Amino acid sequence: VQAVGDIFAAPNGQLVFDAMKLADKGHGVLLLTLNYAGDQLAGKQAMKLAQKAGLNVRQVVTGEEIQFDPNGEDNKRGLAGAVALYHIAAAAAREGKSLDEVAEIAERYAKNMASITVKSTDATHPQNGMSFGDLGETDLMEIGAGQHGEGGGVRVPMKSSKETVATVAEALCRNLELK
């Protein structure tokens, strides 16, 4: 079960808690949360409500975007890696693993994934047309711009897709210490 907020916004804690109640089939609930301020606040509120209601719950936070953690402070944003994480956790649950086992598998995967974004134009809000970012009409691209193009990445001259993939793959492999 997924709890979603308005476009480009996190759901509120009550909505997340309501989704947790729907998901609870007697074996416990794993709350997977992206590492964004709004999602974290909603998750924290929902966890408090769930614990108060006596639900068996665990939480795993995803934060794998390597570009947004320049100081190694473990504040990486959660991105597309969460999709694979949902499937991995669900597969473990379908195999009959306990909530603690599913949470441990999800936590291990979450700590060993990396992603990075690349944008060549600014994103725009579909309802009001507002631009996210100030890349504008340039010959630059931004590596590490976030899932909505919020910015915070590194701007570099536009490259071919082959060169861009090579740059991104090298950064991901270095972050994961792959050879």
Give the location of each predicted region:
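Solvent-exposed alpha-helices and their adjacent loops that cap or buttress functional pockets
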Residues: 22-25, 50-52, 133-137, 178
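Mixed-charge interfacial surface used for oligomerization/domain docking
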Residues: 68, 93-179
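Glycine-rich oxoanion-binding loops at beta->alpha junctions
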Residues: 1-26, 170-175
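Alpha-helix capping and helix-loop boundary segments enriched in small/acidic/polar residues
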Residues: 3-14, 34-38, 72-80, 159
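Catalytic-loop motifs flanking and including active-site residues across diverse enzymes
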Residues: 12, 81-85, 164
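Active-site histidine-anchored catalytic micro-motif
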Residues: 24-26, 38-45, 52-101, 108-115
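General beta-strand structural signal in soluble alpha/beta enzymes
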Residues: 1-9, 31-33, 58-61, 101-105, ...
